[in-house]
Amino acid sequence: KDRLYLSGYFGRDVFNFGNTDNGIGIEIPWGNATTSLRWNHLFNDKLFMNTSLIFSDYRFEFNIAQSEFELKIFSGINDWNTKVDFLYQPNQRHTIKFGLNYTYHEFTPGNASGRSGDVVFEPDEIFKQYSNEGAFYFSDDFDVTDDLKIHAGLRYSSFQHSGYISFRDYLKNDVTSSDDNYRHIEPR
């Protein structure tokens, strides 16, 4: 038996402040958008699978303007996520869960542009950072007796940052970028 679910959320808020006496205007928009596609599959009465594809988008801006001066700062995070979770229940007293998860992150940290009179500052490229995050897990819940229960598991997590570590490194136009990797096995 199969079931397919599609869901989404979109929310954008804006804070505005203006003062006509000195001609200053401030606008701070921010918000989230997310969508997910989920597929549930029942292999048999003991094995169940849940697969999810998820996209999320977070945006934040700060804009200020006063007659001859403008400043805009933008940042955001986009995530693409895939999860596959299995639940195996050989009997009422024993449940095994296992699965994997992968997320691709795209960070846009604090890009700025501005104007002062006729002088305009606009970056040629938007500075971004990227990372990959993944995990495999396994857990076993076993009720030995009504008073003795065992819950054990392992999770292998990995995080990889790709790209320049700081904006200063980015401005140097280095040919190579820095990659950081973190991997751990975690008992559960």
List PLM regions with ranges.
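Outer-membrane beta-barrel channels and translocator barrels
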Residues: K1, N44-K46, Q89-R93, T145-K149
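Flexible loop and strand-edge segments within Gram-negative outer membrane beta-barrel domains
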Residues: D2-F43, F48-M49, D57-D79
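Membrane-embedded beta-strand positions of outer-membrane beta-barrel proteins
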Residues: L6-G8, T51-L53, F98-L100, A152
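Short beta-strand segments enriched in hydrophobic/aromatic residues
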Residues: F10, H41-F43, F55, P90, ...
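Transmembrane beta-barrel outer-membrane domains
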Residues: I26-N32, L71-D79, N91, F127-E133, ...
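Hydrophobic, lipid-facing positions within transmembrane beta-strands of outer-membrane proteins
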Residues: G31-L37, L53, N78-V84, N132-F138, ...
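Surface-exposed coil/turn segments at beta-strand junctions on protein surfaces, enriched
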Residues: L42, S75, Q89-N91, S139, ...
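Signature of Gram-negative outer-membrane beta-barrel scaffolds
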Residues: K97-R188
